[in-house]
């Protein structure tokens, strides 16, 4: 699974996921299913915000090619992927600027058009069950919840799906592709089933063997939204701008 993750996801997403796990004392080389889940959640969060802007009239528009006009504002503020201290700094700044209530838990995005925080969920189970779990945990009407599944289902607060159908279809297609690629490599069952995942983890801990090598050819899709946010994720010793691409899993 670890090799699959490193081949299937953009290197910057992989790096952010590794940092997030290490922040909580977790090892991505051992908890590989969780590693895959975090990478998937990050990519969905980034895809959710990608290409969406607000024009000078306050209208939400989509810009898919080239650099957006300077008058355009990113519709979504990305919170997911930042270290906790920076993430809370961003949340506090948004709350102070907009007057929205501060969430109890860190959300994934902020929607400047609808003036609300968004919690993104990606589940291997039934969407309504996961939605209820999220809602019960958050217990806040100010945080909008949007759940996606690997089977193409989705569920959102008050059936308000925020994005246009095409943008959501792109996310669903990506999730379905990840599922198919995992299944073709015999990884899906352990990823989808907690019991099977626990059994596989024990097996991996005993063997510490490497997974079969995967093809290295990948295709890149540039994300203009994340280009401008790159420096927010960088360590102080790094000055390069973040350029995240959304990768399709390599073909067999």
From Swiss-Prot:
Residues the UniProt record annotates as site (Important for efficient shutoff activity): 202-203, 206
Domain comment, as recorded: The probable endonuclease active site in the N-terminus and the basic amino acid cluster in the C-terminus are important for the shutoff activity. The C-terminus acts as a nuclear localization signal. The C-terminus is recruited to host protein complexes involved in nuclear Pol II RNA processing.
Name of the protein this chain belongs to: Protein PA-X
Gene Ontology MF term list: RNA binding
Role description: Plays a major role in the shutoff of the host protein expression by cleaving mRNAs probably via an endonuclease activity. This host shutoff allows the virus to escape from the host antiviral response. Hijacks host RNA splicing machinery to selectively target host RNAs containing introns for destruction. This may explain the preferential degradation of RNAs that have undergone co- or post-transcriptional processing.
Keywords: Decay of host mRNAs by virus, Eukaryotic host gene expression shutoff by virus, Host cytoplasm, Host gene expression shutoff by virus, Host mRNA suppression by virus, Host nucleus, Host-virus interaction
InterPro entries: PA/PA-X, PA/PA-X_sf
Compartments in which it is found: Host cytoplasm; Host nucleus
Main location: host cell
Pfam families for the chain: Flu_PA (PF00603)
Family: Belongs to the influenza viruses PA-X family.
Active site residues of this protein: 80, 108
Biological process per Gene Ontology, one example term: viral translational frameshifting
Site (Important for efficient shutoff activity and nuclear localization): 195, 198-199
């Amino acid at each position: 699974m670890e090799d699959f993750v490193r081949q299937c996801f953009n290197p910057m997403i992989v790096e952010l996921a590794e940092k997030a796990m290490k922040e909580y004392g977790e090892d991505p080389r051992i908890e590989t299913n969780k590693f895959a889940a975090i990478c998937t959640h990050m990519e969905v969060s980034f895809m959710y915000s990608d290409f969406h802007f607000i024009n000078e009239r306050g209208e939400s528009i989509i810009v898919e090619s080239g650099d957006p006009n300077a008058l355009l504002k990113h519709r979504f503020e990305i919170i997911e992927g930042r270290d906790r201290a920076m993430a809370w700094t961003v949340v506090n700044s948004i709350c102070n600027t907009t007057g929205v209530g501060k969430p109890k838990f860190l959300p994934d995005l902020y929607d400047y058009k609808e003036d609300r925080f968004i919690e993104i969920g990606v589940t291997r189970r039934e969407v309504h069950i996961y939605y209820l779990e999220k809602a019960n945990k958050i217990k806040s009407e100010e945080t909008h919840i949007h759940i996606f599944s690997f089977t193409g289902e989705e569920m959102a607060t008050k059936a308000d799906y925020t994005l246009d159908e095409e943008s959501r279809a792109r996310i669903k297609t990506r999730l379905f592709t990840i599922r198919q690629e995992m299944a073709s490599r015999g990884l899906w069952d352990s990823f989808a089933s907690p019991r099977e995942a626990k059994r596989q983890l024990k097996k991996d801990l005993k063997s510490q063997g490497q997974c079969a090598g995967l093809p290295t050819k990948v295709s890149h899709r540039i994300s203009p939204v994340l280009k401008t946010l790159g420096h927010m994720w960088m360590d102080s010793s790094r000055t390069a701008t973040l350029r995240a691409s959304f990768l399709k899993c390599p073909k067999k």
